[in-house]
Swiss-Prot record:
Its EC number is 2.4.2.9. The lineage of its organism: Archaea, Methanobacteriati, Methanobacteriota, Methanomada group, Methanococci. SUPFAM superfamilies: PRTase-like. It holds the Pfam family UPRTase. This is Uracil phosphoribosyltransferase. GO terms for biological process: UMP salvage; uracil salvage. One of its GO terms (molecular function) is GTP binding. Binds 1 Mg(2+) ion per subunit. The magnesium is bound as Mg-PRPP. Its cofactor is Mg(2+). It comes from Methanococcus vannielii (strain ATCC 35089 / DSM 1224 / JCM 13029 / OCM 148 / SB). It is an enzyme of class 2 (transferase).
């Protein structure tokens, strides 16, 4: 894990060959949906493990079948709330849950519009109650412009007081990190790699494409609400 000296509280895993190999698979245009999802799960699980190294631990006394000894327990692992940004972050959350089994989970549906305005629409928020002892982990594979996460953080800060807020992603653009850190300097960011830049359409380059489409398939637009009302 490397601390990026351009910002305070920003870390990448560019020094970890296993994660870099997984990222290489995700970048590859020939990687299919199933393999892409599995790759996101692997990244979430390993990055969750690395994140536990930054949590507080305390020593305890225990008794083995042979004698008394000392051990350690995490003071934070049972006080974690993972917030998933629909839909691309689901596999990332699945990996995190494998490491942070006691975590509570919240879901936020947020989408970013097209260039040049990149308007953000949030139409579903379901987040469990957060305490001052909790660490909030926001899972979002791609930190591009940062606008989606800034909106999410703004909503969370209105009503929730936590011990710590962490953004965990796969790729980030420097522009997105700049925006987030200017708005919320205390938020920590952990990503597999920080890429070069955003292109004119707001995509990270070299990037890996649309993480949601590559994990679950390209969607088509359909309106189900009128039909659902008719079922009653």
């Amino acid at each position: 894990m490397i601390r990026d000296e351009r910002w305070f509280g920003v870390y990448s895993f560019e020094d970890t060959p296993f994660l870099m190999e997984t990222l290489t698979d995700l970048r590859n245009i020939n990687t299919d949906n199933i393999s892409f999802r599995k790759g996101l799960v692997r990244l979430g699980r390993y990055m969750g493990y690395e994140l536990t190294k930054t949590m507080e631990f305390e020593k305890i006394n225990i008794t083995t079948p042979l004698e008394k000894t000392e051990g350690i327990i995490s003071k934070d692992r049972k006080n974690v709330v993972i917030i998933t940004i629909l839909r691309a972050a689901f596999p990332l959350m699945e990996g995190l849950i494998k490491t942070l089994e006691s975590a509570k989970v919240g879901i936020i549906s947020a989408s970013r519009g097209h260039a040049p305005k990149f308007n953000i629409e949030m139409n579903y928020v379901k987040v469990p109650r957060v305490t001052e002892n909790d660490t909030i982990i926001i899972a979002d594979p791609m930190i591009a412009t940062g606008s989606t996460l800034i909106n999410v953080l703004t909503e969370l800060k209105k009503s929730e007081k936590s011990k710590r807020i962490v953004i965990l992603g796969v790729l980030a653009a420097p522009e997105g990190i700049d925006s987030i850190k200017k708005a919320f300097p205390d938020v920590e960011i952990f990503v597999t790699k920080i890429d070069r830049e955003l292109n004119k359409d707001g995509y990270i380059v070299p990037g890996l494409g649309d993480a949601g489409d590559r994990a679950f398939g390209e969607p088509f637009k359909v309106s189900l609400l009128p039909q659902m009302h008719n079922l009653e």
